[in-house]
């Protein structure tokens, strides 16, 4: 259950953070209406709550692991929303990051 909960929270965090940043990018760089940026700010605020719901008690561990999810998620978002096509090095780098997420979050620890 912990792995499932952690995974769901990381995915929700990625959608909120990457989506929020993308909305702001659209307003500032792509000429969309400024209310897109406002929605982006709201999404980024929502993102901030997801880490607090992670089962692990250590902020540094959760945010460090989430960084790997953010990297892979950003590439995926770019593919879905902007037509970005990652090269093999992007994919290899993202895969390494996801392995790192697993090590950080789920490695056996003393007393755990």
Curated annotation (Swiss-Prot):
The keyword Transcription regulation does not apply. The chain crosses the membrane at residues 8-28, 33-53, 62-82, 91-111. SUPFAM superfamilies: Multidrug resistance efflux transporter EmrE. Coiled coil: none annotated. It is found in: Cell membrane. InterPro entries: UPF0060 (IPR003844). Its main location: membrane. Keywords: Cell membrane, Membrane, Transmembrane, Transmembrane helix. It is a multi-pass membrane protein. GO terms for cellular component: plasma membrane. PANTHER family: UPF0060 MEMBRANE PROTEIN YNFA. Belongs to the UPF0060 family. This is UPF0060 membrane protein AAur_4166. It comes from Paenarthrobacter aurescens (strain TC1).
